[in-house]
Regions:
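Alpha-helical transmembrane segments used as membrane anchors
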Residues: 1-214
Length: 214
């Protein structure tokens, strides 16, 4: 009898993996994680926005300062999000994707709102869209403002846009890069709306010229 009782208790007690799955599916846990993502995206927005005004003064401190110096109370960092916010902004904007890093904030906020069940969205579409815009604008700004990288504290296309642009120029030349940017932008608009194809057909058919002749 005692053995049967122990077996029943073992069956009724959920295993560790099932407990983890249950916690992950819990609506309250989703809400808390979503709220954290939204708050973190607001924090990054503050850090990014402040970087445009305080980045020049903070750059030397971030580049030359050690972890201990940045962790100090009197670190002299002027970014409104503190030394960690200044580091994140400098890394994501200058070292990564430039000002298109704002699309990271957009996706984090949307993902947070979905987890909180504030808005019903197709998260995978937002992920694809934000990723494409992140990469495209990084390359565009890196290519268009390549000559300003040496004279500015902020790299509009980030190091990603700068390095990819240099490689593309070496392969297809400046006109080729503009063509690649144009065709990829058109493909993105087609991905967003099928009406783009209709508009392009009218454009290539020169329908507006035919109307003027009539």
């Amino acid at each position: 009898m005692a053995k049967k009782k122990l077996d029943k208790e073992a069956e009724s007690t959920p295993s560790s993996p099932s407990k983890i799955v249950a916690v992950c599916k819990n609506e309250t846990v989703h809400f808390v994680i979503g709220l954290m993502l939204v708050i973190f995206s607001v924090y990054l927005l503050l850090a990014f926005s402040s970087f445009f005004f305080t980045g020049a003064a903070d750059q030397s401190i971030i580049d030359s300062g050690s972890s201990a110096d940045l962790a100090a109370v009197n670190n002299q960092v002027k970014n409104y999000a503190g030394s960690r916010g200044a580091q994140l902004a400098s890394y994501l904007i200058n070292d990564c994707f430039g000002i298109s890093s704002f699309f990271i904030l957009v996706f984090l906020a949307v993902a947070g709102l979905k987890l909180m069940r504030v808005r019903v969205v197709r998260l995978w579409k937002w992920f694809i869209g934000c990723t494409l815009l992140l990469v495209w604008f990084s390359i565009f700004f890196g290519f268009a403002f390549m000559d300003h990288y040496q004279d500015s504290f902020i790299y509009l296309g980030g190091m990603h846009g700068y390095n990819v642009s240099r490689w593309l120029i070496s392969q297809v030349g400046v006109p080729g890069v503009w063509m690649i940017l144009l065709i990829t932008a058109i493909c993105f608009f087609i991905y967003i709306s099928a009406r783009t194809v209709i508009w392009l057909r009218k454009l290539f058919a020169l329908s507006f010229l035919k109307r003027e002749k009539k």
